[in-house]
């Protein structure tokens, strides 16, 4: 799919230059040039997908939600949650239960580990956020109700949603169950990473590279251009700092979230304590009411972790059964005496156990705080990194800070090196940076742009703000896949493929109508239309008018009912169903309906047509009837007479008898044209030409047509020419067609007798075959007929226009011209002349119907009409 950027207007909007169907709209309802309340809305081809629905950790209540009023949630087709962190998932319950999302048909998807952890994490979130807060977003029951509606998916599972929307989840590292989503809408691929890590740690795999190239990459920019410390170095610094604080008799506070980096640090501390017996007397506490439940979830999804963890588990060594770590459900059971290590949630220390312990331990200089993850601006974790002398307690009191503060990042977010390498491997044409503060995002954009410019790559990088839609234009390349009978023989270059085009979920398939049921399960139907017309004229009069309008007719008798029938243009049947009634029948289609309408209009005007009145006028004889008295046998006799009359009418409708009145030929019928041509041919002086009356009439018509355009036309008689090499390439094409059509006419339809149709196009050869190359450079050399042709005489026309001239062999439809441009012009006019000369039945071919209401035929085409028996099963037998 070829992308292009829609230029932005001065007001920040998009100057739309193409159809809205081909535009991808990306709107951030959160995490646009900020960290927190991640919520990305994608709109393309009538589909709406929302990626993540988090809250902002620096705010509470409604203020923490994304800008949800900017979207009609009933139109959302799917909500995809990348992982269970609050800034990516905590607003989900509010959206599902308190917006019009429930009025739509959208569903929510996340991985199995994410759904399992999400329930426990959200229970803790509800408990903490609702404690002493009147601005509650939702309660426990609403959270559980929404949780039951979430659909869990596996990694690498291809999930299809009706309407051409599908997605696949890939490992993202970061935390247990975290994934990135590769979304495909009508062929457009979008990779939304969420939070991801390209470094394999003690228990998680690194983020995957999807096997297919996306058109758009939406990725995080949390750390901008910063570079992480090597893992072994920061692990050593982390354990050394903890050891140092313990040696000085202090307590270590590690603010973490219940799940995520906490498990990585627990594995590290348990391993370090095992290697240092002198620390066995110092307890490590994991302060969380959900700790035990969360650890059970980790043990359940061991198979999603890295090889190191799976290998230990296969040796019956469960890495999450810690030997030196104790769970602490609440501070009420905590004896705050002596050195210890306390891991407490939440990580931003806005409330909860971590905030309470911070306020309690901050005044003691022996204690130490180690911030191990990313801190959002506006939170206590971010503020205390500035090492203020005082901190503000939850109740507003000022608390002196004397404890040490260290920042050792174990954040499972990519740094610049990992992110830039990942972007290079993805190779997307558009990169959208999200989930990053404005300063970090701007630095990352500049650094990436410099890299792409140095390589000469035309990659577009975007940094949208919240509620400012980004519009990208994509030129969709629509292709249709041929299946079934059509695909049995691959077409050559330039061939026209004729079939049904099926569109489903933005995918196109072309197939033969006969294969429709097999490949789609759709049933087919044919609409046969019948129209009865009351008409008080003879059958011969009807035929006379139809011949004058449509030319050649196919006449016979209906095989089922024995009714004499006329078939017009191979598509519409006119039957004499009764003495004064006609039945018009046809298979419904756009072209056939048009022909049937014209036939019905013609039939309705026959009664009052002046030609009909003139031909049916005759002397009137008035008879006097003698009246007799009725006697009992008269009624029976009259009844017998009525039956006899009805029988006679029925026989007249069924028996193709000749008319008593000898109607003259219609002046515009094919028979009249041939007759007139024969008269003219007999009067012709050239004995070699007059024997073909039809060719003579065609030549006269073409001469008049050309004379009206060029003014100077000569009639010639030329002998048959010896065919040169290049003329031989074109003339046989006409001869082959004519012979094929002649074979059709000789074989015929068993139910019909038809006339030989005339070709409707001309075959041309160029002037370069008429003269040596040196003469071609001169303007309009004369054409020598004697030097070109010899043999039997036949009709020809010579056309002049200034210095240019051309000779037209009327019989073989070959054009010889002094220049290519003049030859093309004459060819076009000759084609028009032939079409105007040929009757409607011969000039227009109505193709066979597809036999399905899904495809009502096609428009008529200018072509030679084929034999009826090859196009549609006939019910007619030859008329005697």
From Swiss-Prot:
Entries under SUPFAM superfamilies matching the protein: Metallo-hydrolase/oxidoreductase (SSF56281)
Enzyme category, top tier: hydrolase
Database matches in SMART domains: Beta-Casp (SM01027), CPSF73-100_C (SM01098), Lactamase_B (SM00849)
Family according to the record: Belongs to the metallo-beta-lactamase superfamily. RNA-metabolizing metallo-beta-lactamase-like family. CPSF2/YSH1 subfamily.
Location of this chain's protein in the cell: Nucleus
One example GO MF annotation: metal ion binding
UniProt xrefs under InterPro entries: Beta_Casp (IPR022712), CPSF73-100_C (IPR021718), MBL (IPR050698), Metallo-B-lactamas (IPR001279), RibonucZ/Hydroxyglut_hydro (IPR036866), RMMBL (IPR011108)
A biological process term (GO) from this entry: mRNA 3'-end processing by stem-loop binding and cleavage
Region spans: Disordered: 618-666, 729-783
Residues that bind Zn(2+) 1: 83, 85, 174, 195
Biased composition regions of type Basic residues, renumbered to the chain: 618-631
Function statement: Component of the cleavage factor I (CF I) involved in pre-mRNA 3'-end processing.
Protein name stated in the entry: Endoribonuclease YSH1
Gene3D superfamilies assigned: 3.40.50.10890, Ribonuclease Z/Hydroxyacylglutathione hydrolase-like (3.60.15.10)
Coiled-coil segments: none
EC id: 3.1.27.-
Range of residues in the leader sequence: none
GO CC list: mRNA cleavage and polyadenylation specificity factor complex
Active site, renumbered: 413
Composition skew (Basic and acidic residues), residue ranges: 730-745
Keyword Metal-binding belongs to the record: yes
Pfam families the UniProt entry points to: Beta-Casp (PF10996), CPSF73-100_C (PF11718), Lactamase_B (PF00753), RMMBL (PF07521)
Keyword vocabulary terms for this entry: Endonuclease, Hydrolase, Metal-binding, mRNA processing, Nuclease, Nucleus, Zinc
Keyword field contains Metal-binding: yes
């Amino acid at each position: 799919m070829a992308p292009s950027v829609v230029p932005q207007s001065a007001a920040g909007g998009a100057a739309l230059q193409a159809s809205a169907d081909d535009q991808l709209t990306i709107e951030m309802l959160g995490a646009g040039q900020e960290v927190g309340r991640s919520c990305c809305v994608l709109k393309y081809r009538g589909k709406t997908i929302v990626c993540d629905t988090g809250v902002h950790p620096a705010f509470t209540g409604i203020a923490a939600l994304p800008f949800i009023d900017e979207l009609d949630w009933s139109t959302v087709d799917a909500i995809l949650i990348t992982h269970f962190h609050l800034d990516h998932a905590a607003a989900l319950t509010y959206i599902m239960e308190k917006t019009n999302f429930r009025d739509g048909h959208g569903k929510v998807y996340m991985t199995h580990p994410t759904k399992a952890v999400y329930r426990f994490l959200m229970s803790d979130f509800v408990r903490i956020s609702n404690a002493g807060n009147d601005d509650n977003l939702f309660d426990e029951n609403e959270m559980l109700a929404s949780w039951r509606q979430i659909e869990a998916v596996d990694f690498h599972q291809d999930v299809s949603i009706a309407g051409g929307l599908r997605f696949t989840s890939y490992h993202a590292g970061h935390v247990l169950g975290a994934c990135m989503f590769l979304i495909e809408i009508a062929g457009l691929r979008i990779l939304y990473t969420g939070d991801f890590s390209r470094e394999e740690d003690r228990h998680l795999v690194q983020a995957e590279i999807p096997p297919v190239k996306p058109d758009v990459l939406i990725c995080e920019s949390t750390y901008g251009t910063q570079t992480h410390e090597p893992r072994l170095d920061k692990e050593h610094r982390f354990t050394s700092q903890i050891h140092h604080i313990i040696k000085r008799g202090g307590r270590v506070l590690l603010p973490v979230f219940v799940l995520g980096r906490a498990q990585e640090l627990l594995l590290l501390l348990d391993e370090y304590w095992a290697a240092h017996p002198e620390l066995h007397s110092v307890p490590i506490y994991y302060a969380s009411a959900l700790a035990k439940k969360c650890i059970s979830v980790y043990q359940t999804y061991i198979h999603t972790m890295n090889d190191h963890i799976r290998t230990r588990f296969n040796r019956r060594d469960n890495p999450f059964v810690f030997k030196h770590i104790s769970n602490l459900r609440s501070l009420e059971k905590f004896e705050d005496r002596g050195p210890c290590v306390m891991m407490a949630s939440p990580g931003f220390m806005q409330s909860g156990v971590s905030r309470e312990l911070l306020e309690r331990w901050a005044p003691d200089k022996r204690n130490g705080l180690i911030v191990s993850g990313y801190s959002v601006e506006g939170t206590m974790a971010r503020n205390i990194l500035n090492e203020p002398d005082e901190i503000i307690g939850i109740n507003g009191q000022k608390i002196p800070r004397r404890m040490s503060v260290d920042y050792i990042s174990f954040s499972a977010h990519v740094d610049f090196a990992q992110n830039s390498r990942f972007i290079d491997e993805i190779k997307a044409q558009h990169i959208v940076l999200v989930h990053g503060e404005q300063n970090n995002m701007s630095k990352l954009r500049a650094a990436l742009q410099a890299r792409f410019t140095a390589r000469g790559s035309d990659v577009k990088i975007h940094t949208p703000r919240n509620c400012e839609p980004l519009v990208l234009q994509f030129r969709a390349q629509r292709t249709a896949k041929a299946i079934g009978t059509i695909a049995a023989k691959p077409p050559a270059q330039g061939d026209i493929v004729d079939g049904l085009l099926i569109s489903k979920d933005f995918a196109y398939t072309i197939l033969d109508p006969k294969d429709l049921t097999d490949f789609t399960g759709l049933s087919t139907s044919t609409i046969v239309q019948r129209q009865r017309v009351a008409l008080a004229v003879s059958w011969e009069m009807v035929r006379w008018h139809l011949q004058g309008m449509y030319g050649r007719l196919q006449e016979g008798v209906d095989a089922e009912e024995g009714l004499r029938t006329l078939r017009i243009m191979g598509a519409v049947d006119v039957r004499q169903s009764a003495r004064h009634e006609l039945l018009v029948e046809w298979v419904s289609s756009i072209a056939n309906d048009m022909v049937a309408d014209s036939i019905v209009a013609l039939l309705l005007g026959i009664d009052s047509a002046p030609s009909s009145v003139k031909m049916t006028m005759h002397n009137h004889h008035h008879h006097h009837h003698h009246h007799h008295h009725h006697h009992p046998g008269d009624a029976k006799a009259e009844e017998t007479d009525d039956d006899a009359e009805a029988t006679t009418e029925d026989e007249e409708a069924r028996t193709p008898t000749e008319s008593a009145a000898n109607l003259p030929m219609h002046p515009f019928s094919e028979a009249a044209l041939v007759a007139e041509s024969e008269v003219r041919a007999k009067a012709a002086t050239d004995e070699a030409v007059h024997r073909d009356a039809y060719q003579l009439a065609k030549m006269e018509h073409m001469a008049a047509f050309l004379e009206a355009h060029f003014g100077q036309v000569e009639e010639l008689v030329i002998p048959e020419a010896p065919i040169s090499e290049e003329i031989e390439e074109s003339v046989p094409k006409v001869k082959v067609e004519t012979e094929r059509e002649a074979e059709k006419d000789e074989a015929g339809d068993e139910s019909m007798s038809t006339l030989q149709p005339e070709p409707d196009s001309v075959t041309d050869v160029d002037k370069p075959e008429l003269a040596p190359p040196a003469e071609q450079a001169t303007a309009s050399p004369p054409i020598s007929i004697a030097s070109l042709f010899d043999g039997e005489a036949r009709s020809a026309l010579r056309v002049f226009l200034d210095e240019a001239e051309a000779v037209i062999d009327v019989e073989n439809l070959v054009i010889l011209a002094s220049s290519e441009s003049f030859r093309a012009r004459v060819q076009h006019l000759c084609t028009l002349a032939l079409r105007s000369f040929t009757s409607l039945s011969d000039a227009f071919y109505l193709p066979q119907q597809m036999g399905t209401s899904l495809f009502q035929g096609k428009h008529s085409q200018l072509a030679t009409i084929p034999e009826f028996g090859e196009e549609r099963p006939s019910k007619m037998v030859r008329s005697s």
